[in-house]
């Protein structure tokens, strides 16, 4: 959900992005120097990460951290002290704080409740009003009830009710977190630990590539009917098997020959059940017949898995039938036909002879680990900053969009959101994805990257956006 008059969602149509994914909301903590912003950030995130020292200017850049409250997750961005008409280093710090405001869904404006409103605070209020962002006025250092009562004088700033807290002692922090959740757009729910039980694996592929033979190899019994006639299996067949010392729930599915919309009768319903099996699974093993050319239908099945956002292992079955000549041509086919999914884990095996089937369990574990990976927001942005500095976006029309901030919106599969000053070139976005994979892995898992591009500033003032 986007904040009105602030951000417009822009998604590269060439990339596989779940438009329904809810980006992780962002809370920016701003204020003049030494009002306790970093101490408040540590209180909100529940751990001591932001650097705190009783001198102004300790925090220089905007620094993001992951936070959780009442089953919801969001990002908290710590900023340096904001001052009007700042010079040199102080000006750079203030600019970073203003950039944090542009990426935020809600701004916490922190004021020293003991000192009261200052000229700098009043100047900051004018800047915040121009930004058109929702603002929560936080009266920090309200360490006792007497100071808490005095904080009511901050109504004069015109930002509504001041909320007294003591970041140092925790006073009022729970109420402030409740208020933050009320003001934020819908924050994604925290994904609870996966319920204990076998991981679900869908075995998919076109007819007669050996799915049922592989299932029977693991189950040790004729659990699925095997016949040389293509299309023997119609209903998905669940089988609890042990692979590599671990229990797995394998779902064998009907072989797919046509698109669902083109199939009819029994084949149509088998296609629907296969689609349902993929949706119900966590990881899919797509079996290809290594002795035959990679077909258009093979690629459609691979697309079904990636479109569903499932972890992926590609198993080239019937490897016992592959000779040296076929291996040469198969390597060329893989380079040509599977170039859009170089991240998929590939295995060469034979369900009939048992060759290399012991490699399947480790491959499944690697794919699932990547599928569930979460990158801490601070680590993600440290990497992204270095990447953009080393290889900035190319200039188009005399200007180049800037990436201001990034967050991981979810996992299973990993979904990332880039906050930018404008749409990114498709090629540059693919470059970011490639480098993201090089840095953090994600072998065997799709990842999704979307862009939240800031609207152009209107004539009404600095930081104001138009609809």
Swiss-Prot record:
GTP 2 binds at residues 205-212, 252-256, 317-320. One of its GO terms (biological process) is ribosome biogenesis. Keywords: GTP-binding, Nucleotide-binding, Repeat, Ribosome biogenesis. GO terms for molecular function: ATP hydrolysis activity; GTP binding; ribosome binding. Residues 373-455 form the KH-like domain. GTP 1 binds at residues 31-38, 78-82, 140-143. Residues 25-188, 199-372 form the EngA-type G domain. It holds the Pfam family MMR_HSR1. Associates with the 50S ribosomal subunit. Belongs to the TRAFAC class TrmE-Era-EngA-EngB-Septin-like GTPase superfamily. EngA (Der) GTPase family. GTPase that plays an essential role in the late steps of ribosome biogenesis. This is GTPase Der. It comes from Salinispora tropica (strain ATCC BAA-916 / DSM 44818 / JCM 13857 / NBRC 105044 / CNB-440).
């Amino acid at each position: 959900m986007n904040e009105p008059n602030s951000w417009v969602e822009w998604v590269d149509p060439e990339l596989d992005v779940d438009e329904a994914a809810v980006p992780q909301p962002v809370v920016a903590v701003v204020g003049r120097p030494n009002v306790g912003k970093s101490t408040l950030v540590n209180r909100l995130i529940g751990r001591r990460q932001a650097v705190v020292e009783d001198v102004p200017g300790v925090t220089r850049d905007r620094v993001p951290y992951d936070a959780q409250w009442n089953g919801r997750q969001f990002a908290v961005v710590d900023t340096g002290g904001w001052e009007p008409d700042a010079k040199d280093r102080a000006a750079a710090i203030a600019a970073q704080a203003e950039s944090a405001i542009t990426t935020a869904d809600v701004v916490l404006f922190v004021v020293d409740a003991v000192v009261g409103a200052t000229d700098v605070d009043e100047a900051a209020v004018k800047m915040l009003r121009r930004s058109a962002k929702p603002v929560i006025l936080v009266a920090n250092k309200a360490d006792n009830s007497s100071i808490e009562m005095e904080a009511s004088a901050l109504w004069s700033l015109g930002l509504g009710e001041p909320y007294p807290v003591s970041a140092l002692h925790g006073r009022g922090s729970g109420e402030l977190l409740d208020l933050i959740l009320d003001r934020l757009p819908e924050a994604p729910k925290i994904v609870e630990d996966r319920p204990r039980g076998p991981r679900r694996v869908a075995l998919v592929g076109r007819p007669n590539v050996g799915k049922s033979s592989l299932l029977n190899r693991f189950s040790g019994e004729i659990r699925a009917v095997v016949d040389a006639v293509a299309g023997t299996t119609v209903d998905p067949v669940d089988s609890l098997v042990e692979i590599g010392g671990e229990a797995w729930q394998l779902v064998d599915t009907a072989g797919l020959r046509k698109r669902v919309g083109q199939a009819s009768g029994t084949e149509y319903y088998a296609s629907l059940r296969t689609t349902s099996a993929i949706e119900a699974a966590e990881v899919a093993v797509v079996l290809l017949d290594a002795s035959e050319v990679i077909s258009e239908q093979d690629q459609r099945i691979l697309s079904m898995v990636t479109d569903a956002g499932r972890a992926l292992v590609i198993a080239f079955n019937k490897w016992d039938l592959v000779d040296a000549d076929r291996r040469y041509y198969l390597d060329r086919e893989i380079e040509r036909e599977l170039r859009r999914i170089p991240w998929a884990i590939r295995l060469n095996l034979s369900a009939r002879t048992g060759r290399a089937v012991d490699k399947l369990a480790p491959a499944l574990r690697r794919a699932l680990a990547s599928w569930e990976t979460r990158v801490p927001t601070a680590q993600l942005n440290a990497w992204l900053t270095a990447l953009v500095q080393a290889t900035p976006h190319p200039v188009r029309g005399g200007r180049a969009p800037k990436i201001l901030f990034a967050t991981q919106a979810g996992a299973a599969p990993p979904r990332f959101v880039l906050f930018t000053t404008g749409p990114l070139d498709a090629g540059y976005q693919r470059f970011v994805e490639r480098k993201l994979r090089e840095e953090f892995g994600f072998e065997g898992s799709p990842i999704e990257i979307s862009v939240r591009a800031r609207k152009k500033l209107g004539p009404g003032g600095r930081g104001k956006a138009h609809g």
